[in-house]
Amino acid sequence: MTDKDNGRDDGGKLLYCSFCGKSQHEVRKLIAGPSVFVCDECVELCNDIIREELQEQSSSAGAGLPRPHEINQVLDEFVVGQEHAKKVLSVAVYNHYKRLEAGSRKDEVELSKSNILLIGPTGSGKTLLAETLARMLNVPFTIADATTLTEAGYVGEDVENIIQKLLQKCDYDVEKAQQGIVYIDEIDKVSRKADNPSITRDVSGEGVQQALLKLIEGTTASVPPQGGRKHPQQEFLQVDTGGILFICGGAFAGLDKVIQDRSEKGGIGFSAEIKSKDEKRSVGETLQDVEPEDLVKYGLIPEFVGRLPVVATLEELDEQALVEILSAPKNALVKQYQKLFEMEGVELEFREDALRAVARKAMDRKTGARGLRTILEHVLLDTMYDLPSMENVEKVVVDDAVIRGETRPYIIYGNQEQSRAASSD
């Protein structure tokens, strides 16, 4: 009698597959394990099942991809205002990942790559938009500073270092990196000094744009492995950048004047449109009329502008928007500081006039949302320093006088209220 469960007969001679029951003579290979045997046919069958499941997952990737409306809703949770930019980004990102899905199928129509250019003042939310997109889509994300980049062979970072940073974010998983998002900040700082080609070599301006061309359009970049130059004998990793979404951002100070000059030239003499002082448009409204020729005039080379077909402009944040940024988003600064104080068992309250005072201060400094944390950190520094050593504190209150530096945060103790700073106790 044969014991098929153990893969042996009573005599201990003939072996059987524990899954399909075939003997060792009916299959090419029988692999032994602890009290179990598996034949090559069952191994191949398992591989086929796994392969089919992976194909089903990749074919349904488009179904799992958030729709533009859903992408916009998530952006609304973290970014205040900038409705036009959110809509442009939602559509561009959706189409980009639909393009990657279509790329795996053979079709007559080949979808071209649509990288994104974000134009807006400092602190308007360019970086936060890109970060939120990457976090929502669960793809690798890295930020590169264009001002540190130079042409290959010169002192500074090579453009290939951008891809290496992306690989580091996903533990050198090439497949994941090839679907990541790269945000290149301060791209306006690599504009050439004049719109006429320079005789001298511009290694940190036009040279960087030239170096970025192929990377952004889609090429196979050779990136050193984890060891880098310490292990030169290792083979370089080959990364196809065709599926990587590149988002370039910059303040482009003075671009509004370039746009105005172009629009004013369009109407001279009797056909000129005369505008009163009241009809003067804001910088944000002017930037919405940006054309590729304006970017070329500003200092970007035509080929580089052509690689960034999707352009989204962001408006300068007003006082009300800054107040909302302080308190409304999921990870708003006020909520973050309230969480820190809550860990000490203390309630932190910001009054409405305090939030407006912080917003006005940020506007005076022209730092946008980026300067809000600096202001709050300065205001709460002494309180956060002394609070862990204090007892019986129930609440800390901040009003506009505290923001203006006229007084310190009010400390409310258990069963009594005292108007004194944490540092005075």
Curated annotation (Swiss-Prot):
Subunit structure: Component of the ClpX-ClpP complex. Forms a hexameric ring that, in the presence of ATP, binds to fourteen ClpP subunits assembled into a disk-like structure with a central cavity, resembling the structure of eukaryotic proteasomes.
Positions contributing to ATP binding: 121-128
Organism of provenance: Alkalilimnicola ehrlichii (strain ATCC BAA-1101 / DSM 17681 / MLHE-1)
GO molecular function annotation: ATP binding; ATP hydrolysis activity; ATP-dependent protein folding chaperone; protein dimerization activity; unfolded protein binding; zinc ion binding
Positions of disulphide bridges: none
PROSITE patterns named among the record's database cross-references: CLPX_ZB
Family to which this protein belongs: Belongs to the ClpX chaperone family.
GO term, biological process aspect, one: cell division
InterPro entries the record matches: AAA+_ATPase, ATP-dep_Clp_protease_ClpX, ATPase_AAA_core, Clp_ATPase_C, Clp_protease_ATP-bd_su_ClpX, ClpX_bact, P-loop_NTPase, Znf_CppX_C4
Family matches, as SUPFAM superfamilies: Glucocorticoid receptor-like (DNA-binding domain), P-loop containing nucleoside triphosphate hydrolases
Function: ATP-dependent specificity component of the Clp protease. It directs the protease to specific substrates. Can perform chaperone functions in the absence of ClpP.
Protein's recorded name: ATP-dependent Clp protease ATP-binding subunit ClpX
UniProt lineage: Bacteria, Pseudomonadati, Pseudomonadota, Gammaproteobacteria, Chromatiales
